[in-house]
Amino acid sequence: MKEPVWEPNPSRIEQSNMNNFMVFAREKFDYVGHNYESLYRWSIDNPSGFWEAMWKFSEIIASKPYKFVVDDVTKMPGALWFEGAELNFAENLLSPAGDDQTKEKIALVFYGESGDRKEISYQDLYNQVSQLTQVLKVMDVHEGDRVAAFMPNTIESVVGMLATCSLGAVWSSCSPDFGINGVFDRFNQIKPKVLIATDGYFYNGKKIDTVSRVKEIGDKITSIESILVVNFSGDYENSVLIHQANTIEWENALSRYKPISIEFKQVPFNHPLYILYSSGTTGIPKCIVHSVGGTLIQHLKEHLLHTDLKREDTLFYFTTCGWMMWNWLVSGLAVGSTLVLYDGAPIYPGPDVLWNIAENERITVFGTSAKYLSAIEKEGFKPGERNNLSSLRTILSTGSPLSHESFDYVYRDIKEDVCLSSISGGTDIVSCFALGNPLLPIFRGQLQCRGLGMAVEMFDEDGQSILGAKGELVCTQAFPSSPVGFWNDKDDLKFKDAYFSTYDNVWAHGDYGELTEEGGVIIHGRSDSVLNPGGVRIGTAEIYRQVEKVDVILESIAIGQQWKDDSRVILFVRLREGLRLDELLVDKIKKTIRENTTPRHVPSKIIEVPDIPRTLSGKIVEVAVRKVVHGEPVKNTDSLANPGALEFYRNLVELQC
């Protein structure tokens, strides 16, 4: 067994929601264990008992009871969950507004890039949702209709989602940094009736006008009957939008109605709630439909139990409305916590911007990406020395595997006594397969545990479950947050092909990972980016972990290039400004990789590039780079934040020999 880098103290364990849930499950159900391993095993062996316990422990509000919890967990896709139950997602998230102890509590705090701050209580949030619900009714929004948002991460975005869901309508959002083609490829598939849009946004100290894009979206997507424009950047009043008959400004629309009691539309457990999108780097984005009940109970499980979120907590996650972590974040309202929203660049005007917010708001749970932690470490920034982080209890990291060095950085330069939970799942399940745990120690490079109720295993090439070795991450039992399906996917053909074409009745997630003897999980990268030199499978994250040790490298991307009837590893690196790749640095990189992995991991070629292509949510795109290197078309570049970067990889002389 390895030595942990952090362990929870007995008091923290005893006071945790996870511990309280174990007591609850022992008293009310047939669970008899006293540790996480036994609880996890019970959740897999008795899924009906576990998910019913979760429903009751989290006090989900429903107008009709369920007839049964699940009909058959071996049926994937197609398992029925909580059949007969009727509920409303927004009603559950706004429930603190009906509690005298929490209705005046701050629900949301918003920070803009310029430092402007706004806050809203649960009662005022309820009132604004009530007003917008009345607006949407006048706009003829009904159960099942789609409302699309082209919005920054603001209070208005949360109000828009809650009002939409209160009516039983379906919410879908993109961040305003999406190009017009990227927005069209997404929203035109789902035919929204209403568009909620911003007149602009701020990033890296610049104000970016979106008025022309909003007008073009409204013109091109003919299903849009009404447009609500949020005057976020101050450009609306002098724009062409003010003269459009189907367009109204947000404040103007809400001011026409007084807050009244919301009639929450009661819908079945499996009723569509969100439409999220795949990255779209291999074609038109897939429209992934997530359910009301599945999203709610899964997020409550992850917030209450795995994150140990409580009413007195303040939760922050750096995200945009175009990333599933936004959907995950806003579900924290159901717990009664205070959520902190931020829109802008995470390191503008300096690397301290998010940590200043953490100090000012006394944030207890701070969520970010692995890439961000690596970036501020390379900047030499030490939040623990600059900021008072005494309230900080948990740091969450996702988006890509968190390197061993980033674990060291957090405990050395941010805070010694903090639960650093690397989490992994995806848009596909709007949640996590592996994540944090208040009961368990932290080991460098590992996610603490598999999520309760998630039958996660690693399969070898023969489809056999393996421990302590690398394999395909799969889920062998149905789970509530499995998508309803893809939008407009006749007979679920694309949905089945995406997740169930590799194994029968087994979800293949597309991650390459490992289950450890400590009970944790290691993610080695995406399966479609796995390198295969000489027939040996290597996850790209194994290489990135070593490259991050070389301080002059800001970012890297590795691919496999077909070469002489085999595959060879190619590593591209972006260096600090003013530096150049020479033989000494190449030798240092290769030596670092060889000494910490195997000779097979050592790249055949290391090439300097000025930029690394990435998605709008910050994920590097190995598949797109591999396609360009091999002269294959990249079908959809509108999902990339910097599509022009792909040109650096085309027809490289270095790869011709």
What annotation goes with each model-predicted range?
Residues A149, C174-D199, V214, I347, ...:
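AMP-binding/adenylate-forming catalytic core of the ANL superfamily
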Residues P152, V194-R213, G234, D343-I347, ...:
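Adenylate-forming
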Residues S166-N252, E361-R362, S369-A370:
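Structural core segment of the AMP-binding/adenylate-forming
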Residues G294-T314, M324-T364, E379:
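Conserved AMP-binding/adenylation subdomain of ANL enzymes
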Residues L305, R393-G520, S527-V530, I543:
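Conserved AMP-binding/adenylate-forming
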